[in-house]
């Protein structure tokens, strides 16, 4: 937890991976009390049992997280439960789809977006392995399908889509801290992303 706080520095938006940081409820409460930081809280499967994982996310929504993120694979009942946890709070629900092998066709991606929205997603996150430049084009084309989409590619070829997504309408993108490891292939560091944005703005 202390290492996570050091990596956060003075950033204004951060993803809290509960499965990686493993905070106590008191530690998470203290972290979310920092009103000058917007938090996306997620707990990927494989570390905690399902009830513990969902308990963390429910608590995060009620303690002031801006977003909680669940995977599409967790099913409709979990999505409904997490949507209910957000009711009456400022917290928004992200339903995410990850494909670490390839980028599906545009039609498949649009079907995935519709499925996520059908589960109550305020934000749909799509992250796919990019194996060819055309995959970047497919992912970025999704921004024409309405608001509330964060779509980008993973892997070396997909790096450019992480930057381009901001110009296409993404509310945020994901970067690695300068003094820590990334959580997905192809992530730029905070400093690298800032240099890219500043270069485009100059």
Which role fits each region the language model picked out?
Residues 1, 101-103, 132-134, 157-160, ...:
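A short acidic, often aromatic-flanked loop/helix-cap motif at beta-alpha or helix-coil junctions
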Residues 1-54, 62:
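Conserved N-terminal beta1-alpha1 strand-loop-helix module at the mouth
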Residues 2-5, 28, 57, 79, ...:
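Generic hydrophobic/aromatic pocket-lining and core-packing "Φ" positions
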Residues 10-12, 36-37, 59-67, 86-94, ...:
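Glycine-enriched alpha-helix->loop->beta-strand junction motifs that scaffold or abut catalytic
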Residues 13-23, 42-49, 57, 65-76, ...:
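Catalytic beta/alpha-barrel core
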Residues 20-36, 49-52, 72-90, 104-108, ...:
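Active-site-adjacent beta->alpha loops and helix N-cap segments on the catalytic face
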Residues 109-116:
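Anionic-ligand binding region
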Residues 143-202:
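C-terminal alpha-helical cap/extension of soluble enzyme domains
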């Amino acid at each position: 937890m202390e290492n996570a706080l050091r990596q956060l520095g003075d950033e204004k938006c951060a993803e809290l991976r509960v499965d990686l940081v493993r905070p106590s409820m008191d530690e998470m409460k203290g972290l979310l009390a920092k009103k000058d930081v917007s938090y996306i809280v997620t707990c990927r499967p494989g570390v905690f049992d399902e009830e513990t994982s969902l308990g963390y996310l429910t608590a995060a929504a009620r303690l002031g997280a801006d977003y909680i993120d669940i995977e599409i694979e967790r099913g409709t009942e979990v999505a409904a439960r997490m949507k209910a946890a957000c009711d009456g709070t400022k917290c928004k629900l992200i339903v995410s789809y990850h494909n670490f092998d390839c980028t599906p066709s545009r039609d498949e991606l649009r079907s995935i977006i519709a499925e996520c929205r059908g589960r109550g997603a305020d934000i749909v996150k799509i992250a796919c392995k990019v194996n060819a430049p055309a995959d970047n084009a497919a992912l970025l084309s999704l921004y024409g399908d309405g608001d509330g989409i964060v779509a980008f590619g993973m892997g070396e070829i997909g790096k450019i889509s992480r930057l381009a997504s901001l110009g296409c309408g993404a509310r945020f993108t994901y970067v690695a801290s300068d003094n820590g490891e990334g959580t997905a292939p192809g992530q730029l560091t905070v400093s690298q992303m800032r240099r890219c944005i500043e270069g485009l703005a100059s």
